Amino acid sequence: MAKVIGIDLGTTNSCLAISENGQTKVIENAEGARTTPSVIAYLDGGEILVGAPAKRQAVTNAKNTIYAAKRLIGHKFEDKEVQRDIESMPFEIIKANNGDAWVKAQGKELSPPQISAEVLRKMKEAAEAYLGEKVTEAVITVPAYFNDSQRQATKDAGRIAGLDVKRIINEPTAAALAFGMDKGDNKDRKVAVYDLGGGTFDISIIEIANLDGDKQFEVLATNGDTFLGGEDFDQRLIDHIIAEFKKEQGIDLKQDVMALQRLKEAAEKAKIELSSGQQTEINLPYITMDATGPKHLAMKITRAKFESLVEDLITRSIEPCKIALKDAGLSTGDIDDVILVGGQSRMPKVQEAVKAFFGKEPRKDVNPDEAVAVGAAIQGEVLSGGRSDVLLLDVTPLSLGIETMGGVMTKLIQKNTTIPTKASQVFSTAEDNQSAVTIHVLQGERERASANKSLGQFNLGDIAPAPRGMPQIEVTFDIDANGILHVSAKDKGTGKAANITIQGSSGLSEEEIERMVKDAEANAEEDKKLTELVASRNQAEALIHSVKKSLADYGDKLDAAEKEKIEAALKEAEEAVKGDDKAAIDAKTEALGAASQKLGEMVYAQAQAEAQAGESEQANASAKKDDDVVDADFEEVKDDKK
């Protein structure tokens, strides 16, 4: 059976896990780390860096280094949250032809799913390296409060990366899965999963029930904010530093892309340090310069100051907790365990706020960075048929419906309905002899249609002429286990039907996705070629170094013709290494190896002779030592004092 990997595709960091025979393991990436920064860098020559290597070069390549792409996924350029991010991001966010928010790097226009696919591809490669086999299937997690557009876009990202996404599951649900399966007891419990990640916040109330040895995870309610996370906490600190520096020096660092990137790194580091210490210092020499010369930034930040800067963000996370509890029909006293997930939940002030609201200490035995990937891996093993002791009942986070007369939204599926689910309702025409209707699909909680998220629209035509209110048009909403919506409309009189799978949403057409899949495959081939070229170059340079050293030591023992032949081969190999032709490098390396064979034999013979001489010298020294030994008689002396 094909293995299904679990991927937590995070805003700031991503994580990969696999579950086999009931045992889960977090898989390390190529750099040996258990989490991978969700950072992608596009270089001049077309090379793409992902993770730590991309993060390391961000300061010198700020405009082409993309982070937090997940905040843009499934969003329109005009969305107020996107407009807010444009002001703080050092890279360029643009409006795509379809109105979506895309990114421009190295002159190329890139969609968020395309960018996220690079992170997923790195995860896929790490899994293949660990398992020693090809991996094509995955379970990918998304914030519980992601809407249909964002879920579809995440699925598209997986497809571009060469992965068949078997299931999209909610991050808090995955974390609860990891927590519940780790507990050996059979106790039924209600848990609150507070998930404050890099870019999004979710709260889910989940009931874990034991059913004859199997565990059922039922999501009772979920709520959240897809634009609240660690990135916002970082930004508050960055804004504070910029304001203080402007007061002192009169220079606005917001206009300096390189300075902004350095500030981002420093703010993230300071934030982490303030989780364990009471004060930290930010030192950024040569942050900028003016007519008087270079300027240095040195500033002390206390934990109390940082907490005051982000107090309202922490308060903002508590409101969805209240709504989720109310929707679940529970009070804080009904919650058995509070689980913290997401890196930002490590902040002491966040933990204090959660404890104050729920009236109990959050659990510390769940790894906030890895739990989501572990849960996804467990679900992956369930889907591959590897285990059957887990049943997951998730919900749709937002209500779904259509626009009806008067510009109102009529809901067909209420929020927090367990999925998969299906609902139908009969509607009619608003005008006499109306021959077509437009089905406008919406997602959200507002009564006014325009205040909700538009997921797409389609037409049902050829309706038989009839007075208004007479034709019967049945609209059916069908949500699959991924939380992705399929809508159909049928004229009950004529039997004519039309349907739509809400895809617009990732903004990508089938043709665009296919092109991006091909681009990603081409990139993978390019990466492979680059790796092979670097390996050949390293091999050649190692041989060049070795031959040069041997020539310096033993060149005078070679005849002139032999030495000339080696020097010529050496020169050709050095020239080949400067180029990008792998075949030429390999050929010249082989030629140098053949030309320097006699020199190599000479070096080997000399090394053997030296080794034998060393052994002989050691034997003589040992014999001399034996000759110097004096035989002696020993007599035991008894101590009378004892």
Curated annotation (Swiss-Prot):
Transmembrane segments: none annotated. GO terms for cellular component: cytosol; external side of cell outer membrane. Induction: By stress conditions e.g. heat shock. GO terms for molecular function: ATP binding; ATP hydrolysis activity; ATP-dependent protein folding chaperone; heat shock protein binding; protease binding; protein folding chaperone; unfolded protein binding. InterPro entries: ATPase_NBD, Chaperone_DnaK, Heat_shock_70_CS, HSP70_C_sf, HSP70_peptide-bd_sf, Hsp_70_fam. The modification Phosphothreonine is found at T200. The keyword ATP-binding applies. Residues 608-622 have a biased composition (Low complexity). It comes from the Bacteria. GO terms for biological process: chaperone cofactor-dependent protein refolding; protein refolding. It holds the Pfam family HSP70. Acts as a chaperone. Belongs to the heat shock protein 70 family. This is Chaperone protein DnaK. It comes from Neisseria meningitidis serogroup B (strain ATCC BAA-335 / MC58). The gene is dnaK.
